[in-house]
Amino acid sequence: MKILNLENENRKFTKSIENFHVMEYLQDSSVSPMTAMEEYYMSKMNVRRRQVVIELDKEHSAIIQSGAMQWMGGHVQATAGIKGIGDLFGKAIKGAMTKESAVKPEYVGDGYLVLEPTYKYIILVDVEKWGSSGMTIEDGIFLACDGRVKNKLTARKSISSAVLGGEGFFNLSLVGRGAVALESNVPEDELIEVELENDELKIDGNLAVCWSSNLDFTVERSTGTLVGSAVSGEGLVNVYRGTGRVLMSPVAPTDSLLTATNTTQANPTVKNNLPLEN
């Protein structure tokens, strides 16, 4: 199969890792007179539609989030990736615990697989560069991965990290070789990468997008005592200890696009400084 105009003056590939490519629409031309101005300024502020384009062959298959496929071309087939009732039950539990779809279809064959467009920012990651333990990701940001990448659950190191942090007991971990596509609420160039070497990182809130799976992740008080936490104005913080990497978003939480794109919600301190209405 040959696609003649996948790239043109308005559609460009902005990043590629192996057979995974991010296609970005420089501007949304399919607008009405009522939305033209809004779409114009959105494109100027880098709020654009993006899609993942995956090339499939005998060496590369792809696992995607359920419902993410837009179209596929060539001799491509979708499989459920389920190996019996027990496997289905296990995947259902995994999905419920990680806010991901219970069954992620795997596409195999020879051709192209194109995912649904999104206004979120797509981050491509080479899992192998995260070491033998792989990477753990924040709930709900998985979009797709190479078929060679294994998906597994990683339990929190302590019950406190789930109960006190208001999060689940498990996160999705990815390990192996190949590319992974993640949906981020902020662009990749705004993310901060922190390398730890027998060190620790404390973050106020769920700002971490992904981290090395071998890091110890707990939730603790920001200071040694309850009084100290009260005086400092900070409560609980996420703590990452050990040797590894953390990719974090300093400008917006990772939990929702609305929160990420709303200045008042993205920075809780703003609402305390807003002028009172008469």
What residues fall within each predicted segment?
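Composition-driven recognition of glycine/serine/threonine/acidic- and proline-rich low-complexity segments
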Residues: 1-278
